[in-house]
Amino acid sequence: MNIRTIVIEGHEQDVKISRTERGAEVTIEQHTRRAGKQDICIAHIARDENRESRYAKATEVAKVVYGTDCRGRAAATNSMVHEVLNEMERVAGC
């Protein structure tokens, strides 16, 4: 069974994780007057990437999902970042 897309309800906007040929792509939806709706990619996850690299990308995605603190870090605990990483890896097929 392959999961193609997962949508996570974020702090201010939803985060969409979609399966690609090489792994997964994490996007957010942005609305502009000129272009209308656009999907902005915030991370690419390759199946053959090492775990540290995927964790660093999950930390950046967690900033969008959970918001940031006053220092600009993700307002999430380590286990919350691991939950985001787990969903990204499920879609990518890691």
Label each residue range with its predicted role.
Residues 3, 37-94:
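Mixed-charge, Lys/Arg-enriched low-complexity segments
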Residues 2-40:
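Amphipathic, interaction-prone secondary-structure segments
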